[in-house]
Amino acid sequence: MYSSEELWNSTEQVWINGSGTNFSLGRHEDDEEEEGDKHPFFTDAWLVPLFFSLIMLVGLVGNSLVIYVISKHRQMRTATNFYIANLAATDIIFLVCCVPFTATLYPLPGWIFGNFMCKFVAFLQQVTVQATCITLTAMSGDRCYVTVYPLKSLRHRTPKVAMIVSICIWIGSFVLSTPILMYQRIEEGYWYGPRQYCMERFPSKTHERAFILYQFIAAYLLPVLTISFCYTLMVKRVGQPTVEPVDNNYQVNLLSERTISIRSKVSKMVVVIVLLFAICWGPIQIFVLFQSFYPNYQPNYATYKIKTWANCMSYANSSVNPIVYGFMGASFQKSFRKTFPFLFKHKVRDSSMASRTANAEIKFVAAEEGNNNNAVN
C-alpha cells in the first residue's frame, strides 16, 4: 500500500523537488561518478525479500486451506465462513499480485515494470487492503448481530446475504481505490544514476494529505473502532440466559460456569482480532500520517528502516489471518482433520486410547461401588 513510494536504499541526503513527492536519491547528477562506483548493497536488499517470501509461503498455504476446507465441507458453508473465505481470497490476491513486486524494490534500484504495472499493482494493492478492512468490519458486525439478536439473525443472516455483502464490498473497494489510478505514476529520480520510481504524484500537498487521511480513517481507524465496539457488545451479551433457569442449584452453577467459560473465550478472541489488526497495520498507517502532516519530517536512512519494518508488519497480517479466523475455530479444526486425516493419525490414536482408558476406569469404579453396596446390604 505504501511500499512503492520513497523506498530509500541510501543513507545519504535526500533532495526534495517540486511538491515534495518527487525526489532524487544518492549523488547529484552533476557529481562525477568514479569508475567502479556502484550503489551500496544493504542487508535489507536480500533480507526483506526473504521475509516476504516466507510471508507468501505461509499466507498462500494457510488461506488456500481455509478456502478448500470451506468449499469441501457442506456444513462449513455458513455466513461467517463465507466472510472468512472472502477474507482469505483478498489475502491471496494481495500476496500473489502485490508482494512479489514490492519485494523487488529492495534489491533493485528502481521500478522496472513500466507505467501500466505501476498503476495496476498499486491499484490492486489498495483494493485488496480496502476489501480486507471492510470484510473484517462486516465479519464483526455479523458476529455481533448473531450474538445480540440470535432469533432475528435466523431469518436475515444467511450465506446468500453474506455473498451479496461480499460483492458489495468488492465493488465499494474498487470505487474507493480509483484515486490511485489517477495519481500513481512513474517519476524520474537519481540514485547512483538516473532511476525510475513508482509513486503517487498529487496535484498539491492538500490533495496528498486528504488522501492519506482518508486511508488512515477508512483502512485503519474506522475498522478498529467498529471491531472493538462490536466485540464489546458481544462480551456483554454472550452468556446471558435467554430463558429463566429453574430453581435448581446444579443448573444455576452449570450455567454460571458456562457463562464464565464462554465470556473468557470471546474476550480472548476479541483481544487477538483487534490487537493483531491494530499491531500489524498501525505502524505503517501512523508513519505515513506522520510523514505527510509533520512539517519538520526529514527522510533519511533511519526513517527508511522504520518504514521498511512497518511494511513488513502490515504484509505479515495476510499470512496470520488464517490462524486467527480459521484454525482457532473448533469447526475449522474438525473439518481440517477430516480433510487431512493422515496428519492427525497419531493424535487420533492417542485420543482413542485415552478414551478407552477413561471408560475402563469408569467401569472399574462403578464395579467397586456395586461391590461395596452389596457388602453393606
UniProtKB/Swiss-Prot annotation:
It comes from Oreochromis niloticus (Nile tilapia). This is G-protein coupled receptor 54. Belongs to the G-protein coupled receptor 1 family. Glycans are attached at N9, N17, N22. The keyword Membrane applies. Expressed in a significantly high percentage (45-60%) of mature GnRH1, GnRH2, and GnRH3 neurons and in immature GnRH3 neurons, which had migrated to the vicinity of their final locations in the brain. Only 5% of immature GnRH1 and GnRH2 neurons have receptor transcripts. The chain crosses the membrane at residues 50-70, 92-112, 120-140, 161-181, 210-230, 270-290, 306-328. One of its GO terms (cellular component) is plasma membrane. GO terms for molecular function: G protein-coupled receptor activity. The gene is gpr54. Disulfide bonds join C118-C198.
